[in-house]
Amino acid sequence: MANTKKKPVTREAICSALRSSAEDYLRRVAKAHPSETMYAFLLEISCEGFSVHGAVATEEALGRHSQNQLEKVRPIRTPDPLATLRSCLRWAGPEDGWYQQPDTAFDPVNRLLSRAETEALYEMYDGSLHELCIQTLRAMDEALDRDEMTQ
């Protein structure tokens, strides 16, 4: 019988899977909401550091959420109450008007993170996943900048 032992998980493998998952998730959101304008993308991680998901904010979702909230709050005394509320809610918690899970895009990286936990690649709560996410987002941002420069 062939040896089926898997290679240990590496930080590089996690970064690669993070990027693939993030790009897959962004494509899925764009396909589901083709006429919407994204203004933010974030990676939400567990405090323990062994799971990750994405969230996307769009101008249109912010508008819908703001309008919905405007109908629920006391009158806002500004020249443009909706604009004031949009400004307040733009960077509110990602549960408010952002597109989030459930989505299977992050399943591959979460399987790797589960293995990383089992293999004790890093300590729980040590910030390693946070650093890997920052590294991945920077690489994605650099790639986006390069793409924009060639257009």
Residue ranges and their predicted role:
Residues P8, D80-Q151:
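Low-complexity intrinsically disordered segments
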Residues R27, T58, A143-D147:
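Soluble, non-membrane globular domain cores that form compact, hydrophobic packing
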Residues S16, S20-S21, S35, S46, ...:
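Generic serine detector
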Residues A32-E71:
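N-terminal interaction modules that seed assembly of large macromolecular complexes
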Residues A2-M38, L42:
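Short N-terminal edge-element motif at the start of the domain
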